[in-house]
Amino acid sequence: MAGAKVVVYGLSTEGYALASQMAIKGADVYIIDESTPSAISLKAEIAKTYPNVSSLKEDEPLLAMEPIDVAVSKAQYLFFTPRIRKTGQDVKTEIHSKFKDAITSLKKNSSVIFTLPTGFGGNNENISLLEHVTGLQAGKNISYFYYPLEDLNQQPKIIGSFNGKEDLVLSDLLTTNKKEKKFVGISSSEHFHAIDILSRFSGLCSILEVCKYAQDEITKKDLSSSNFQEIFLDNMINGLFDLKSLGSSFEGSNSLMYLINGSVKGIDGYMKRLIDEIRGTLKKNDLK
C-alpha cells in the first residue's frame, strides 16, 4: 500500500479527513481545492500538524503543488469528495458537473471512489458518465467503488464495488482500528446504506416526536435525565443529505417515502421548536 498514488477531489471536511488518514498511512496524496487550478501535496507531517481542514486553511502553510490534470492522470485512486453548495433540484446537476471535471484526466487501470450518497440506482448513472468521459470500461480497465461518508466518526464498514470485486490496497487505505472493509456489489451497498440511514433517522425522529408532547416539568425532567439528552444537533444534521438523496430515488408515494418525508419533517419541526424556545428564553430574560 505504501506509496499508492491518491488524489482526493474536494477540499471538504470529509475529503481532508480521508486524505490525512491515507497520507499518514504512507500514501502519496494530492488533494484538489476546486477553487484553485492546482492539486496540493499532502504529506504525513502536514496531516498530523493540521487535524482538520479549518486549521489548514487558517494557517495557509506553503505546500507543493502540481496542475490538476497532471495529478489526476497519475492517480491510482481518485476519491470524489466535493463541497456541495447547491440545494434542491440543482444538487444533482452540480454533482454531475463536478464529477465530470474530476474524472476527465483519468488513465487506464485507475479507480474511482464515489463518497457522496446516491440513493437507489445513482451509481449506475455515475458509471455510465465515467465510461462516456474516459472512454474506459468499468470492471475491465477502470474500477468504480461506492463509499458514502455519512459520518466521519463512523466510516462505512462496507465498500460497494463494481461486480463485487475486492481491492486489498483500497481496503488497507480505508481501514481504521484494524477493522477490515467488506466488499459487496454496488446495488447491495446502496441498500445497506439506505437501511443504516433510515434506521437512524426513524429512531431519532420517534424520540423527537414523542418528547414534544411532554408538557409538565416532571415529565420533561425525567426525559432529560435519560439517554435522550445525548442527542445533539450534529446527530440530526449528519446524514440529512443522504436521507434526501434516498428520497430522490422515488417518484410517487410508497412506504419508504413516508418514512423519509416523516423523518425530514420531524427534524424540521424540532428545529422550529428549538428556535421558538430560544427566542422565548431571550425575551423572558430581556436578552438580545
Predicted regions located by residue number:
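Structural/interface elements that position substrates and couple domains in central-metabolism enzymes
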Residues: 2-288
